[in-house]
């Protein structure tokens, strides 16, 4: 508006000002009048940005659309209904979960010295042994595979208690029960994979880590450059259908001692060996840490 007024005033002072001011007046009108602004500025800008953004794969769309919101939606919107929150039943521990919290967790906490762990840059061997023998790494795994099958609430209580004594130990127990491949195997693994890995994970014979974070993209799964290309290759003397992996990961918790890696990458099938689809988006593979080509850097 100010620009239009200045242009009109200058037009009375000099004809040349009018000639130069007309384009400025027209531009101002386009900016001020909403339908014109939408037609000439907003829509073209949105279209240009949309063309520049990478497309979302079906896998990524499923991840974005999965799940529902709970009471926390009201909290983030700034208008929480506390009466609704208070009406929700408070979760309770089972007798087995409470006993574990009162006994095994208390015993573990009594063994921990965070300053010693910090100075040694590692958990003491006897602490690791106790964690493995008493099922701290298999809280999420069903009992038929040797796990404890604890509820999410119980796991939260266990980790909170351990963290009050040693954050390092708590994180070491958290990863196998959250980012570890246990839950992925339960939902998507074959029976052969479940029988192969879940008992070992529950007993602590297998130590997992989850390879998501990359040096370039951080933990933004949609931006990771790591790839797996479907192809035929030689494995143990036979030609098999598999994946040729190319990845670089960083800041992977437990990686230096892990025996199995849950690896996140983007899968491609340029030769259509699996079907007509070429890009499959983000997926995961279970990879032994000792597999040829896997290089784990020092801590």
Model-derived features: positions:
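A gly/ser-rich beta-alpha-beta helix-loop segment of oxidoreductase catalytic cores
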Residues: 209-230
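A short core secondary-structure module
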Residues: 238-294
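Amphipathic, small/basic residue-rich leader segments at the start of a protein or domain
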Residues: 4-6, 21-176, 183, 188-207, ...
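Hydrophobic alpha-helical transmembrane segments
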Residues: 12-24
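Short beta-strand micro-motifs enriched in acidic
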Residues: 229-233, 267
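Hydrophobic transmembrane alpha-helices
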Residues: 2-15
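Short Pro/Gly-enriched beta-strand edge/turn motifs at strand-loop
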Residues: 207-212, 244-245, 293-297
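Flexible loop/turn segments at secondary-structure boundaries
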Residues: 146-151, 178-182, 216-220, 251-254, ...
């Amino acid at each position: 508006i100010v620009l239009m007024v200045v242009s009109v005033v200058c037009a009375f002072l000099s004809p040349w000002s009018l000639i130069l001011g007309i384009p400025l007046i027209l531009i101002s009108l386009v900016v001020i009048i909403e339908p014109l602004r939408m037609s000439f500025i907003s829509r073209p800008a949105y279209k240009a940005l949309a063309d520049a953004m990478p497309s979302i794969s079906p896998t990524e769309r499923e991840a974005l659309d999965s799940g529902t919101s709970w009471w926390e939606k009201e909290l983030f919107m700034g208008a929480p209904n506390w009466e609704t929150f208070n009406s929700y039943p408070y979760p309770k521990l089972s007798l087995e979960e409470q006993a574990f919290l009162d006994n095994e967790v208390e015993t573990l906490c009594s063994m921990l010295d965070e300053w010693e762990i910090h100075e040694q840059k590692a958990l003491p061997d006897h602490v690791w042994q106790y964690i493995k023998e008493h099922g701290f790494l298999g809280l999420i795994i069903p009992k038929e595979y040797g796990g404890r099958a604890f509820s999410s609430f119980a796991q939260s209580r266990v980790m909170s208690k351990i963290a009050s004594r040693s954050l390092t130990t708590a994180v070491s127990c958290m990863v196998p029960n959250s980012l570890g491949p246990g839950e992925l195997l339960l939902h998507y693994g074959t029976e052969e994979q479940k029988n192969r890995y879940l008992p070992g994970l529950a007993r602590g014979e297998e130590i997992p880590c989850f390879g998501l974070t990359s040096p370039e993209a951080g933990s933004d799964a949609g931006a990771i450059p790591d790839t797996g290309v479907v192809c035929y290759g030689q494995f143990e003397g036979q030609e098999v259908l598999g994946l040729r992996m190319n990845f670089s990961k960083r800041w992977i918790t437990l990686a230096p001692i892990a025996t199995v890696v849950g690896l996140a990458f983007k899968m491609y099938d340029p030769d259509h060996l699996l079907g007509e689809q070429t890009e499959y988006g983000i997926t995961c593979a279970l990879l032994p840490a000792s597999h040829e080509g896997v290089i784990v850097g020092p801590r």
